[in-house]
């Protein structure tokens, strides 16, 4: 369990589109990225009773973000380690694969 800060900028050249969130664990942060996408889908489809998507659609959403990164706290060093979009995508894939296997 390590504190993780998620940094998101949705549009290029629009600093006002920057948001951040903090999570108690890395997995909560990765799930938070999925929830951001799910919220966008709900806004685009307000009358849909359910929202479904596949991982390629989620990754396309992540790729179109101007910036997405997270800072994961490492207690041993007392520092936050930055992670890129690609790292986040790899770990979301592993998380979802693990959840699907349960």
UniProtKB/Swiss-Prot annotation:
InterPro entries: EHR_sf, ERH. Keywords: Cell cycle. The keyword 4Fe-4S does not apply. May have a role in the cell cycle. Homodimer. PANTHER family: ENHANCER OF RUDIMENTARY ERH (PTHR12373), ENHANCER OF RUDIMENTARY HOMOLOG (PTHR12373:SF0). Belongs to the E(R) family. This is Enhancer of rudimentary homolog. It comes from Echinococcus multilocularis (Fox tapeworm).
